[in-house]
Amino acid sequence: MAKKLKKNEEITKKFGDERRKALDDALKNIEKDFGKGAVMRLGERAEQKVQVMSSGSLALDIALGAGGYPKGRIIEIYGPESSGKTTVALHAVAQAQKEGGIAAFIDAEHALDPAYAAALGVNIDELLLSQPDSGEQGLEIAGKLIDSGAVDLVVVDSVAALVPRAEIDGDIGDSHVGLQARMMSQAMRKLSASINKTKTIAIFINQLREKVGVMFGNPETTPGGRALKFYASVRLDVRGTTQIKGTGDQKDSSIGKETKIKVVKNKVAPPFKVAEVEIMYGEGISRTGELVKIASDLDIIQKAGAWFSYNGEKIGQGSENAKRYLADHPELFDEIDRKVRVKFGLLEESEEESAMVVASEEIDDLALDLDNGIEIED
């Protein structure tokens, strides 16, 4: 019996060696024909963690789970009219430029407001802008920019406005069934590999349509077929909720709106998280507003009554004054922002911060011992 088992092991080992040799030969032939790196073991890749770029909104970075938009992936932002889709995309453009990258904006709707983009922090002198005559032209331009490897972010606004050339050349009323869907499907097949290879972030803004005759379920759908839904690694549903009223002389005027951004699809982190932001008219997402709210919930900023304080120092009475204080003190804003990101695991804690946390815990333990009447030895 023992001899039989030993013989079986020898056969298995010999067969395994032959398979390994055959695999090595196949890999060598593939590298010879298609170049080094055409096939590799997953663990051999230099970067296994997904690289991200901040969305420009702290709340959205937290909802995305990875700390921002994944590089080399396709993002779809959709929602009703005037919900803030372009605003969310422009914040990503501003963030890409802030990090030293180059951004391009394919304005198929021919509706980009340069003054509003500048107010959101976009450097309009450095922004690459294209207003294509047809959908094919817009997607071709986006493809060439991505293939160059020199562009970090490409925004297409919007998929619904990417009109096929045949539809433009035809008459109003002509039927063009599935033409746009086929165009988008072909574009996704061509662009997806290049986007991943060049680590470009491609954001597609989309509108909403309603399916006719739907009795049960959600009648809403996005134009452009199903291809974008499949190829997108992240899909964001942007919807405005309640109006934000002003104070003082503007108490009867609407100065912004509360907006919910739901992550309905996420291939790099758990989906279905919701980011609640304030979009102020003419200013975009209130970064100080979301920081005050999130930091207060984490007790990084302490709230006592109407007063907000940080590290024992009062920063404002009421949220509006606290927001204004942080806007006037960018160093403090960055410090609190970093602490929040570390808390959610979006950034690694530095050695100095770890030492400060340990010291703070020791002080708290000492204070607790004194309160309990315990003698502290010298």
Swiss-Prot record:
**GO molecular function, one example?**
damaged DNA binding
Give the main location.
Answer: cytoplasm
The record's section on InterPro entries has:
AAA+_ATPase, DNA_recomb/repair_RecA, DNA_recomb/repair_RecA_CS, P-loop_NTPase, RecA-like_C, RecA-like_N, RecA_ATP-bd, RecA_C_sf
Specify the signal sequence span: none
Any single Gene Ontology cellular-component annotation? cytosol
Is-annotated flag, keyword DNA repair?
yes
Which of UniProt's keywords are assigned here? ATP-binding, Cytoplasm, DNA damage, DNA recombination, DNA repair, DNA-binding, Nucleotide-binding, SOS response
Query: GO:BP terms for this protein?
Result: DNA recombination; DNA repair; SOS response
The UniProt annotation places ATP binding at: 79-86
HAMAP family from the entry?
Answer: RecA
Q: What is this protein called?
A: Protein RecA
Originating organism? Streptococcus pyogenes serotype M28 (strain MGAS6180)
Source lineage: Bacteria, Bacillati, Bacillota, Bacilli, Lactobacillales
